[in-house]
Swiss-Prot record:
One GO term (biological process): mitochondrial translation
Cellular localisation: Mitochondrion
Descriptive protein name: Large ribosomal subunit protein mL58
The encoding gene: mrpl20
Protein role: Component of the mitochondrial ribosome (mitoribosome), a dedicated translation machinery responsible for the synthesis of mitochondrial genome-encoded proteins, including at least some of the essential transmembrane subunits of the mitochondrial respiratory chain. The mitoribosomes are attached to the mitochondrial inner membrane and translation products are cotranslationally integrated into the membrane.
Organism: Schizosaccharomyces pombe (strain 972 / ATCC 24843)
Length: 197
């Protein structure tokens, strides 16, 4: 005996969804206002009429704003924005660091023997008070030059290292990893410099 299956009993395995799209909708859903030609009158304004102008929330446009509400800017020669001759050619100072510190002395040849002796005396007397920063400000030099002229005493170096080790205990894992990578990069650079020489 043969059984035949009618097509009406067959159900599709996958569900196919069809979209009914209306292809006739306009490209711009909201129609734009026609542009107002230049020189055309928007409204008749007399002395007796009172006008209320509510501008749109957009950048001001001279073609749309009525002449009554336009701002008459003062001429350039009347504006209070005249610059001095020095500041006309220089950009504005961004921060305190960008201000020039005067003529700094970078080498030991620029220091006199009296300056070198006084730096060494002050550094050995009180290294906590006379740091490289304070001495560089006093003698108008760089901190590197101060450290070349006179090194800090061993007790001061040991104290600074102990403070730094105490700060390291508060570091997180990310900061430790960044510092380790920086140290390895610096070591690699010094090896490269030695290899080039």
């Amino acid at each position: 005996m043969l059984f035949t299956i009618k097509p009406s009993f067959l159900k599709p395995v996958g569900f196919i969804q069809t979209r009914n799209l209306n292809r006739l909708y306009p490209k711009q859903r909201i129609p734009k206002r026609p542009k107002i030609p230049m020189g055309s009158k928007i409204a008749e304004v007399t002395e007796t009429t009172s006008a209320y102008y509510n501008p749109p929330a957009s950048s001001p446009d001279v073609r749309i704003t009525p002449p009554v509400f336009r701002y008459d800017a003062p001429p350039i020669h009347q504006r209070d924005t005249s610059l001095s001759k020095e500041s006309m050619f220089l950009p504005p100072a961004v921060s305190r660091k960008s201000k020039s510190k005067g003529k700094l002395r970078f080498s030991t040849h620029q220091l006199s023997s009296e300056d070198i002796k006084s730096i060494q005396d002050l550094r050995t007397k009180d290294p906590n008070a006379w740091t490289t920063g304070t001495l560089s400000k006093k003698f108008n030099t760089t901190r590197l030059l101060i450290s070349r002229v006179c090194e800090a005493p061993k007790e001061r170096i040991q104290k600074v290292e102990e403070n730094f080790e105490a700060e390291k205990l508060a570091w997180g894992s990310k900061k430790r990893e960044i510092r380790r990578q920086r140290a390895s990069r610096q070591a690699f650079r010094t090896l490269e410099r030695v290899a080039q020489v």
